[in-house]
Amino acid sequence: MIRTMLQGKLHRVKVTQADLHYEGSCAIDQDFLEAAGILEYEAIDIYNVDNGQRFSTYAIAAERGSRIISVNGAAARCACVGDKLIICSYVQMSYAAARLHHPKVAYFEGENQLQRKAKAVPVQVA
């Protein structure tokens, strides 16, 4: 049995650019890609915290250290500069591997400052 699991997550990054006329994709600072284990050209799902939009595209690398999150092409209609996003990638694996799997999660605040990294999403308390 194959399971689809969270592989990497950029939590609450801020959109710095939205370019409707750029060829598709989402440009992400190379440091951020590495923090979440997301590869260039990997499929990603994006969840817009500010407007509730959910959409899929692929990651491309932005300049290392630039703190850029640029939503491009048709996806630019789903996010505005300043919106907070959750960007996720997923991986498929066997049930046995999934039981041992830990995602790479990177948490951000302010102007895309990396606050911390984790290998799990915290348990939600009542």
Swiss-Prot record:
User: Which branch of life, at top level?
Assistant: Bacteria
- Kindly list the GO CC terms recorded for this protein: cytosol
Q: Which GO terms describe its biological process?
A: alanine biosynthetic process; pantothenate biosynthetic process
Keyword entries, A-Z: Autocatalytic cleavage, Cytoplasm, Decarboxylase, Lyase, Pantothenate biosynthesis, Pyruvate, Schiff base, Zymogen
The gene that this protein is the product of is panD
Q: Which Pfam families match?
A: Asp_decarbox
How, per the record, is the cofactor bound? Binds 1 pyruvoyl group covalently per subunit.
> Which EC number(s) are documented for this chain?
4.1.1.11
Q: What is this protein called?
A: Aspartate 1-decarboxylase
HAMAP family found in the cross-reference section: PanD (MF_00446)
Which PANTHER family does this UniProt record tie to the protein?
A: ASPARTATE 1-DECARBOXYLASE
Question: Which positions does UniProt annotate for substrate binding?
Answer: 57, 73-75
Identify the NCBIfam families for this entry.
panD (TIGR00223)
Spell out the post-translational modification annotation for this entry: Is synthesized initially as an inactive proenzyme, which is activated by self-cleavage at a specific serine bond to produce a beta-subunit with a hydroxyl group at its C-terminus and an alpha-subunit with a pyruvoyl group at its N-terminus.
Pathway noted in the entry: Cofactor biosynthesis; (R)-pantothenate biosynthesis; beta-alanine from L-aspartate: step 1/1
- Subcellular location, in the record's words? Cytoplasm
EC class, as a word, reads: lyase
> Where mainly located?
cytoplasm
So what family is this one in? Belongs to the PanD family.
Enumerate the catalysed reactions: L-aspartate + H(+) = beta-alanine + CO2
Q: Which residues carry this modification: Pyruvic acid (Ser)?
A: 25
Q: Whom does it interact with, and what assembly results?
A: Heterooctamer of four alpha and four beta subunits.
Entry-linked CDD domains: Asp_decarbox
Catalytic residues, chain numbering:
25 (schiff-base intermediate with substrate), 58 (proton donor)
What exactly does this protein do? Catalyzes the pyruvoyl-dependent decarboxylation of aspartate to produce beta-alanine.
Molecular function terms, GO-annotated: aspartate 1-decarboxylase activity
